[in-house]
Amino acid sequence: MAPKAEKKPKVEKRVPGKEGETSKKKAKKSNETYKIYIFKVLKQIDPNMGISSKSMSIINSIINDIFEKLAGESAKLARYNKKPTITSREIQTAVRLVFPGELAKHAVSEGTKAVTRFTVY
């Protein structure tokens, strides 16, 4: 008869909350908003005007929704053209697809102006 294999001792499983164990805190998710930028634009339009926190929250949500739509459409365009990078061209095309008529034209011209201003400095 062959000798029996040795039994290994059971390994204790670590259970959270045991003594001597340091618990890792869950990392905070950064919650970035556009509130300061919305406020700056508001002050450019009318320095005496104010905005309620509820209105600020609504405008911030609108901007986040638009950003998600444009990012998603840009990603689809990049995938469709088999490109690994989203360039200004994909973003410009996404703006034309997402925004209606005249709004798209103005958005494209303002975006082009901003990119030109950014690349000059």
Curated annotation (Swiss-Prot):
Modification N6-acetyllysine occurs at: 7, 13
Domain of life: Eukaryota
Molecular functions per Gene Ontology: DNA binding; protein heterodimerization activity; structural constituent of chromatin
Region Disordered, annotated ranges: 1-28
Annotated InterPro entries: Histone-fold, Histone_H2A/H2B/H3, Histone_H2B
Entry keyword Transit peptide: no
Keyword Metal-binding (UniProt): no
Primary location group: nucleus
Functional note: Core component of nucleosome. Nucleosomes wrap and compact DNA into chromatin, limiting DNA accessibility to the cellular machineries which require DNA as a template. Histones thereby play a central role in transcription regulation, DNA repair, DNA replication and chromosomal stability. DNA accessibility is regulated via a complex set of post-translational modifications of histones, also called histone code, and nucleosome remodeling.
Subunit structure: The nucleosome is a histone octamer containing two molecules each of H2A, H2B, H3 and H4 assembled in one H3-H4 heterotetramer and two H2A-H2B heterodimers. The octamer wraps approximately 147 bp of DNA.
PANTHER family recorded: HISTONE H2B
Name of the molecule in the record: Histone H2B.6
Organism (species): Triticum aestivum (Wheat)
Gene: TH123
